């Protein structure tokens, strides 16, 4: 037997069979686990993660170095407004399509009317960028689930045919009628008309939750015979589920970071107020001590002045008393000497 061809992984360049590589980027299983496709924390666009600590894409990393931490966009609320109050995606869409309108899914004022060409991709709905991505992801899942349902029907019909072929050797006449009925029923299941397929596609869009509940019952049959298309579809659905979980984790991390920033700002404000209050208290104590010192010095000077004035007053009183006595002596002497 000829050896099967090996193909190189685009990340580690090691060679693997074609069935073991992913359909899109041709990555091996280890590289898909080590470098998953995640969404950027800021712009929410998908990129291949180089390390577990890297949660933003290269473009946002360059913008962070150049412009600093972004702010939430005033339209879509995505934390990607590096310049001004709007992100680059909303700025370009506003220039091209005009003012934003209300999204039919999230009810935010962040959906841009892309006319018939853009609405045709989302069944005529007016959706914002994030809701459009989630809607397309649901469509992709329903298509993959339809393929898995079709393959499971074909596998079940082929297994039933083999069992009836074994039974055909014993009961030929009975099997002839039974095989005719089974083949006609199988033809009805496998060959649907275009109108029926379109109706099934629309029904799968409307009841995607019911289809998602039915598909886990068919998974063991799919896993028994993996091929490049089936394994890639399973990997894509698993990656999309992991991406949704990572989006939720990223949103929770953003909320935690915003709350931490808010808490730090409040702590900083409290520290500044405490510092200002301490400075005011120190200034008040300094002024109070100065005023007390000044008041004590003034009281001391006042007491000294009063004491000096009292002493001077006593001396003056003594002088007045002495002068009054001298006048009396003078008057009495003049009276005695007169004839």
Curated annotation (Swiss-Prot):
Key word Glycoprotein present: no
Chain positions covered by the region annotation Disordered: 144-243
Cellular localization per UniProt: Nucleus speckle
This protein's UniProt keywords: Acetylation, Coiled coil, Nucleus, Phosphoprotein, RNA-binding
Phosphoserine, modified sites: 22, 148, 193
Residues annotated with N-acetylalanine modification: 2
Keyword Coiled coil attributed: yes
Comment text on domains: The basic polyhistidine region acts as a targeting signal to nuclear speckles.
Name of the protein: Protein FAM76B
Originating species: Mus musculus
Gene: Fam76b
């Amino acid at each position: 037997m000829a050896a099967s061809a090996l193909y190189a992984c685009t990340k580690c360049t090691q060679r693997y069979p074609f069935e073991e590589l992913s359909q899109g980027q041709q990555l091996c299983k280890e590289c898909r686990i080590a470098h998953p496709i995640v969404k950027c924390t800021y712009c929410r666009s998908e990129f291949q993660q180089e390390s577990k600590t890297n949660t933003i894409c290269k473009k946002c990393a360059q913008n962070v170095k150049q412009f600093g931490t972004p702010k939430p966009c005033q339209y879509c609320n995505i934390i990607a407004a590096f310049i001004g109050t709007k992100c680059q995606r909303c700025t370009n869409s506003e220039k091209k399509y005009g003012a934003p309108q209300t999204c039919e899914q999230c009810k935010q004022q962040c959906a841009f009317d892309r006319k018939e060409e853009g609405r045709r991709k989302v069944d005529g709905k007016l959706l914002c960028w994030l809701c459009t991505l989630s809607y397309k992801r649901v469509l992709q899942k329903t298509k993959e689930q339809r393929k898995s349902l079709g393959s499971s029907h074909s596998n079940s019909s082929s297994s039933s045919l083999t069992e009836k072929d074994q039974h055909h050797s014993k009961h030929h006449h009975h099997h002839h009628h039974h095989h005719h009925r089974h083949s006609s029923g199988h033809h009805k299941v496998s060959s649907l008309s275009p109108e029926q397929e379109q109706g099934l596609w629309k029904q799968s869009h409307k009841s995607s939750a019911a289809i998602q509940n039915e598909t886990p019952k068919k998974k063991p049959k799919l896993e028994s015979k993996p091929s490049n298309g089936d394994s890639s579809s399973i990997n894509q659905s698993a990656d999309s589920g992991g991406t949704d979980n990572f989006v939720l984790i990223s949103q929770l991390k953003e909320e935690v970071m915003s709350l931490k920033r808010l808490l730090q700002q409040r702590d900083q404000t409290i520290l500044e107020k405490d510092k200002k209050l301490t400075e005011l208290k120190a200034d008040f104590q300094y002024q109070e001590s100065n005023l007390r010192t000044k008041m004590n010095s003034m009281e001391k000077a006042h007491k000294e002045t009063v004491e000096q004035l009292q002493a001077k007053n006593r001396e003056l009183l003594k002088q007045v008393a002495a002068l009054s006595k001298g006048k009396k002596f003078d008057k009495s002497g003049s009276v005695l000497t007169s004839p």
